[in-house]
Design a protein with these regions (language model features):
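Small-molecule kinase domains that catalyze NTP-dependent phosphoryl transfer to phosphate-bearing small molecules
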Residues: 122-190
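Conserved lysine of the Walker
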Residues: 15
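Hydrophobic positions on the alpha1 helix immediately C-terminal to the Walker A/P-loop
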Residues: 18
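ATP-dependent NMP and nucleoside kinases share a basic, alpha-helical "lid"
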Residues: 29, 78-142
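Post-Walker A helix-loop "phosphate-sensing" segment adjacent to the P-loop in P-loop NTPases
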Residues: 24-31
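P-loop (Walker A) phosphate-binding loop of NTP-binding proteins
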Residues: 10
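ATP-dependent small-molecule kinase phosphotransfer cores
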Residues: 33-98
Length: 190
């Protein structure tokens, strides 16, 4: 059975670290909605910095495309995933293991589940929410960027399978242990 993990959380909560652990331990292929947005902006001359000015640009342009078509970023990432799967299928007949590491909007889960299942059939989906209070105080955020819909909408999504509190007491070993527990519970027999 195919496996697809959605990871959500605020800036600095540890999403990228969690994705890396799933990749390293269980060969999940990471994908990020933000990669395509960053590609568009780099092509347009953005310097790639995620300072306050850069974050505002990411949020504003991302929102502009979502206003044009709510599923714009979902459909683009799905196309990227399909291309990866086509290559994977060509070389092997392994199960598909995907992890999307930067879910910020509800449709990024619901729409992806729908179109993925339509194309690839039965799939085990899980959603992990990372909560990292005060995890990275060096991030440049202001009230506007902190309260942007890209930082707040996902809080309304209630179908979270696992919540990881990634505070000052959690170290990398702890995260590895949590990932192992989740994997064994959700995927060991599939």
């Amino acid at each position: 059975m195919h496996k697809l993990i959605f990871v959500t959380g605020k800036v600095g909560s540890g999403k990228d670290t969690l994705v890396k652990i799933f990749k390293d331990l269980y060969s999940f292929e990471p994908f990020f909605y933000g990669d395509n947005l960053k590609t568009v902006l780099l092509y347009a001359g953005w310097n790639g910095k995620k300072d306050l000015k850069g974050r505002k640009l990411l949020q504003q342009v991302g929102r502009a495309f979502r206003n044009y078509d709510e599923d714009f970023w979902v459909n683009w990432l799905f196309d990227d995933i399909c291309m990866y799967i086509d290559i994977l299928d060509y070389f092997s007949n392994n199960d598909i293991r995907i992890i999307i590491g930067d879910v910020r909007h509800i449709n990024e889960i619901t729409r992806m589940k729908k179109i993925f299942t339509e194309k690839y059939g039965p799939t085990k989906f899980i959603t992990i929410k990372m909560i990292g209070p005060n995890r990275d105080p060096n991030r440049e955020m202001d009230k506007e960027t902190t309260e942007d819909i890209s930082e707040t909408e996902i809080d309304q999504y209630k179908d979270i399978d696992y919540t990881i509190i990634n505070n000052e007491t959690v170290n990398i070993k702890d995260l590895h242990s949590m990932v192992k527990i989740i994997y064994e519970k959700e995927f060991q027999d599939s």
